[in-house]
């Protein structure tokens, strides 16, 4: 086997000590500046405690679709919010930077809507034409998990509870 000489890329989320964080929280990860000066920020929206809980795929999928609209309405420069494979939260990407407090407040408002007001009509893109796995949605599960997350309180700090 040939010897590898190039360094392997460092994946930030694999460097995080998942035993030290206290979910739910919003964590600022990093900012990247593009060749034309454009700034993109990455945030960890951790909804459940790593290695203790995972949101079932149907509920996480429904939260994903719903907050795609709700966070876009609340966070200027919203680009994307994609679920972690471990099903404990999401990566949020934005143009520019936002405080973790502002992001946590937007997330809290979005989860409050899901938990207490959302109907099936509020969940976008749930058809075969608009979703790559349209059968794997559960508004009931999304609502129950949103309530659990809100009961815990969303912190603007991953290591110290600073609930917004």
From Swiss-Prot:
Signal peptide coordinates: none
Residues annotated as binding Fe cation: 61, 65, 131
UniProt name for this protein: S-ribosylhomocysteine lyase
Cofactor: Fe cation
Organism for this UniProt entry: Bifidobacterium longum (strain NCC 2705)
Function: Involved in the synthesis of autoinducer 2 (AI-2) which is secreted by bacteria and is used to communicate both the cell density and the metabolic potential of the environment. The regulation of gene expression in response to changes in cell density is called quorum sensing. Catalyzes the transformation of S-ribosylhomocysteine (RHC) to homocysteine (HC) and 4,5-dihydroxy-2,3-pentadione (DPD).
Cofactor binding comment, as recorded: Binds 1 Fe cation per subunit.
Assembly, per entry: Homodimer.
